[in-house]
Amino acid sequence: MKPNKPKIYPVIFKPASMPTSKPALKRAGVATAMAAYGFFASGVLASSAVVASAVAANAVVASAVVLSQLATSPVAVAQAQDFAEFKKRNQQQFSQFKQDQEKAFAEFVARWQQAEADYIQQLREHWSDAKVSNKTQWVKYSDDQRQRTTVDYETDTVTVEILDAGAGSGAKGTADTESAVNEALRQVRELGSTKLSTAVSQDPIHISAGMNFSNVRSSARMQGQSVLPAQFTQVSKQQAQVERRADRTVVKVKLPPAAGNDRASRMLPLAKAYAAQAGLSPALVMAIIHTESSFNPLARSPIPAFGLMQIVPTSAGRDITEYMHGEQQLLSADYLYDPDQNVQAGTIYLHLLNNRYFKDVRDTESRLYLAIAAYNTGPGNVSKAIANSNKLADATRVANRMTARQIYDRLMANLPATETKNYLRKVTSRQKYYQEEFNL
């Protein structure tokens, strides 16, 4: 069963004068073109009438002659030429659309990566260890770039660093440290009121990349959810660990153990809803979210990939939008930062891996291992690890001669990237955890 298809607001690149999806192009194909050029009105109806008359007169030869005359008449020849030209134009338009789409996708990646590189270079004027947000960390700098706040969703730690090159020793140093701790605690408390939508719209890299968030239509979940739940940001000085360095004061605050489970619990309704629509285990969806982002809704990577389930707009995003809308579209970052929309998109991609790419693998557990690995590295790499071939049919044939355990072991032995091996191990382990701890 296909998941519901809610309204989405991605960045879409397509010519306004032509249909762009395969179904739409088919609908604009032979039958429509024939009608447009009069085949049904003149050629087909006329030939039907003549043939019927000929048959009635038992003149089979005559009917063949009539049909031949119809096919070679000036009108029919002109119509056939027009139709051939129409098909050629249609194919040229579709080819041009695909080229425009590929160009737009490539420009999106280049624009994002350049904006990120420029921002890091700017930060290095103040920070020797300049860094930006990633899959498990959300990083924010003050306007003057002399303060840095890092929320680490994997370790449940908030770190505030304040540059203080003039810090000395003795009483002045103590006073500076006291001031830095107070400022750090204030920054931590602010996280409880900083909405996800605000964090996204004010991100310097998004702004530099030319992403306009003035008309972002986010779900109520994104509008209402903050970077950290307010109950976990009310910290005291006693909870802060302070470290003085040559160029800065570092204040670390460890969040309560319940913080991680709280984030998981917030995503559980989404995982259940979309997993049910896709015919998947909600524990699997939760394990993927945990492994991809540690439930960081603002997760991103340099590829770039965005959000809880780390959707890459230019690869997985194409499959997802074609499934949802019948055409490939470029999902924007703000769309994928929305938890609701991201979990739906990620679950659809899991569904496609499990039920399309590896649908002919008979054993359910075997198919699951292949889909998990493919979510990280792509179906082609998984196929090569199983069958030493990029063809999915070859991988399917080999997989159907193996047990699930043998497939798991072969993936762990043959997958080229250590990251993917660790990914498969973590997801399968965490799936069991969510099955047991959350009764999924």
Indicate residue ranges for each PLM-predicted region:
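Catalytic and binding regions of secreted/periplasmic enzymes and modules that target cell-wall glycans
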Residues: N342-L392
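Active-site metal-coordination segments of metallo-dependent hydrolases
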Residues: A259-D262, A333-V343, T418-E419
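Active-site loop and adjoining helix of the penicillin-binding protein/serine DD-peptidase-beta-lactamase fold
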Residues: L330-A333, E365
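Substrate-binding/active-site groove segments that recognize
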Residues: P302-Q329, Q341-N354, R401-M402, V427
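Cell-wall glycan-active module
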Residues: K2-P15, P19-K22, K26-R27, Y37-G38, ...
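Secretory-pathway/luminal and periplasmic proteins that interact with or process carbohydrate-rich
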Residues: S293-P302, R318, T377-S389
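Short, functionally critical alpha-helical segments immediately adjacent to catalytic or ligand/cofactor-binding
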Residues: K272, G279-R300, I311-V312, G346-T347, ...
